[in-house]
């Protein structure tokens, strides 16, 4: 059993262990036996659940008579009356005068009983994790899972930080803390000027995925606009055309099966793509033009075709014929006619006219005078290999190949098949080959399901399906990698109450502090003149000099405390860490309101700011500086509850009589614990300059 482990009875009463006390210091019953578990009585009232009290009372009766008790159901006598009757028959009391061996005081009228209590699987160990700077996935983002898994900042946390106007915190969270940043940390440890943050790899990959799906991305300052990707734009991106893959299945379009060397002219050709980790774009030349699958709806609306009619047209005249039809349209004249129709059309007809007009306006905004030049393509962009890697599995006997590589291969094979079909001079065969090529490109772009079967019972997904997710947006690249960023320098643990902490403090496991403050300790030691290797060894050994640096860091570098879901800005605040033992977080109960926190196993995340600008923002986001909520001026986010209200009430009551004098506050507390004075006894503390 550890502090933070979760306990529950059979009636919904649950909570975490906040303190573990030795038997010789634990409250004792009337038989001088230490009590196993102490519960607050507030839980019974708040849950309106007397069943747990009845069980505990009857448990004492069962213990005395030596046999189980069956509580009758659906009788005139209720359970409380039944329990009282049995207790009276067997001479069992529900309340006892318990003894505190520490103070020597007897405490009367305390409910004591026998209850079935079990420890839940969700424990301190399962909730605990602490991460410094290490371990990244293929997208260069901090890896998740395990004791060192990264914790994320999602859209709700970003909104909370925006509400705080914590711009520097957001800046580092979305750049250096959410991506492998070796150059930054190397400079930081040596106290050198930090290099400017780069565009994160996941952002570049996201843009590349859009372009890979046939969508052009135009950036003008802070504005981004999307439109059709043309052959000219693809040529500008590309370092050259890849070879058409052979229809002979023994020849790979990726790597050699025997030695894993990249195939010449293939998807990992060193000259065209830069090799297995290359950063060069390339492209595939199609046998003949096709309709860009992303803009099929635009094409069929401009040509007044149904989906079936467009599909048939793709098979008969192909992209070349459809381009001619599109280029015959006078976009300006058509736009004028459509605007006139918006005045008379209604319902679905009006909806169709408006969509058609929007497509025309979009073309003109992107500089197209001919629709065919925008929507018909004959070059397929191939994103750099670093964004579609082939990596060896951890077992070493298999290759993990990015889905997109299979789909590129399928496009190449479909293009080769169309070329071969033309040699047959059979219209039906050629039509089927054209449709197959269109479907292959659609699978690659992600507008339809892949024609290639998945591996290991997993579907292969194209670009758009990868971006948006299948089934739920939460599974997509946009949500998992762009809107939510895993972070370095994070921790997570179960929250337990600790009223000894200051309102701006949080008790953090010492092991977690050594992990999350590792880089700051290294910087401090190197600044004191220690060599980097020696400094690293000192941190690992927790040398006194390293501990001194850690203690200095936590005095001015607070941690961000976050309890998900972040419904408002008070769900993410800052607090100064206080080292504690164990693997649970200690929280001042006054923090509960803003964090939507209770103590039934709730876990909280911690994030450490890096740059001084972010540290200064964190210092201004402590609870003492965020006293008031967002609703109105009297909406306190720091408000006493339960025992704190009782304490505040008793603090206003002062007994009449002589003032008791003590040298220190600790001495007065010892006298209270011995029972020499009461909470309402007036005292004079010498160290407080005679304050009463």
Q: Predicted regions: what is each one?
A:
Residues 1:
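P-loop NTPase nucleotide-binding/switch module
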Residues 8-9, 13-14, 33-38, 47, ...:
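Conserved core architecture of multi-subunit DNA-directed RNA polymerases
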Residues 16-20:
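Short beta-strand-centered aromatic/proline hotspots
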Residues 21-26:
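Short, conserved beta-turn/loop elements at beta-strand boundaries and strand-helix junctions
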